[in-house]
Amino acid sequence: MARLGHRVTIYNRGGKHVSGAGFDSSDMAETKKTGFYRGVRVRKVPTIDHKGMAAVSSSFTSAIITAFRRFDVVHIHAEGPAFMCVLPKLLGKRVIVTIHGLDWQRAKWGGFASWYIRTGERQAAKHADQIIVLSRGVQQYFMDTYGRETVFIPNGVNRPEKVEAKLITEQYGLKTNDYVLYLGRIVPEKGLRYLIHAWNRIHTDKKLVIAGGSSDTDAFLEELRKEAGDSVIFTGFIQGRMLAELYSNAYIYTLPSDLEGMPLSLLEAMSFGNCCLTSDITECTDVVGDHAESFRKSDVDDLRFHLQKLLDNPDLVKKYKQEAADFICRKYNWDEIVLKTLDLYRRPPRH
């Protein structure tokens, strides 16, 4: 949007990086100096940097700021922040809400947090001029629950450059096709317990790499570590070159989730030309079509079967790899997605 000449401002929570200050990238360091990232203005808002309060406080202050600034459109992402969507709406702003998933269903949220997030969902259904959803399943949910029409505009992905294994070899002893990769947040709904239980029954000399940071779920991460065998590597949060190397050199990428919005990591994995194995939830199968393997959600035995099948059939893995990148980059093109979003911004407000 910025390249097309639009003035875009992002309001981001203050405080440290979710995985620690050491994970601030060089790009983010430059953004702190200039206030811009690739032509987009970035502003941090006052935030109570405490477990359970960061998202609530930052979305509240963002809503107040955007309500009183001279913006044509206020675009809110996720159900929790949508709790405040009525504020900019009352002051004449056109309000768009993107629903990334039914976040109140996530296992990590307790009573108040789940109520707050679901109330945000209801506020979006009532007050937003337009609602964007990332999956057909969520689109149907909004129609069935609220009688509210939404617009399906999925995430996009760009074709990356694959890179050779270097850092992952130095740090973890990993080589090309030497491991199965999971990359995402370490939270219960991602199906990681099923994955580890299935992996413990697999016959292979490959490693299982679980890459990603916990999100207020440190106790869950420790439980997984205790259940995992010696062939499982936990990297913690990763980014930059290390991230690209893990995607570029995996034998299989797997996403065993019980619950998703639209899994951006799955798009990224396919854009790197990975053979993917996902659970059969609609949010995953709609993305991959017949260009990946799937197993029955929550079924450890079926997950183990498909993992072993792919580990024992390198020709099948090669076939999936050869078609993945072309398929996904055509299907989820960022340029087309930006134009669809801009068209939505131009629609008249809802009264």
PLM-predicted stretches and their roles:
Residues D178, Y182, V187-R201:
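A conserved mid-protein helix/loop that constitutes part of the nucleotide-sugar donor-binding site
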